[in-house]
Amino acid sequence: MTIQQALETIHQKLQTFTQLAHRPKSAVTLLAVSKTKPNEAILEAYQAGQKAFGENYVQEGVDKIQYFEAQNIQLEWHFIGPLQSNKTRLVAEHFDWMQTLERAKIAVRLNEQRPANKAPLNVLIQINISDEASKSGIQPSQMIELAKHIENLPHLRLRGLMAIPAPTDNIAEQEAAFSQMEQLFEQLKVAFPHQQIDTLSMGMTDDMQSAIKCGSTMVRIGTAIFGARIY
């Protein structure tokens, strides 16, 4: 299957899942997770209409961003991996979105390092919704406090929440985690009515339907678009 065919298949699924959830298809954005994938694969996806790409590794992502900028191809780049404080400058200078914000210290650095001639960096707070020791993200109880920090940083724009629940094939368990995220998302909107909080990034290939049922506005899909991972 070509990347174009894979994207068509995913868009058909998005159409089905949004209809079942009584939501317009336009309510859900597809983020193509392109980590470890070559520029040729990203170009193929772009030529098939894909504009938003997610990268987990800072330097690899920056190399790709610079490659496509040199080709004059305008893509939207999301950083979706864990971020160490010594790598914040590269994210602040090159990416459009940062989806894994979990510390005020990182927010302050991103704000200071965001170039003045660029639009504010769109950020999502990562919630550790399944309370896994191995996963990044904050506890739900810490959300409002971190959001208040972000609100005061002029070069960041708080757009919503992101989560990676513990993987499970049990639909009820998937929906329990995602519906908890949906409630937190609504709380965030109420608490910050003047912020453009419109993005709930959750759902991957195997739990996309549950995520969309529970209000996801962005699903992150890698293998189903690009095939098995290339190391």
Regions found by a protein language model. Give the residues of each.
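Gly/Pro- and small hydrophobic-enriched strand-loop and loop-to-helix capping segments
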Residues: 216-231
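Conserved alpha/beta-domain cores
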Residues: 1-187, 191-206, 212-214, 226
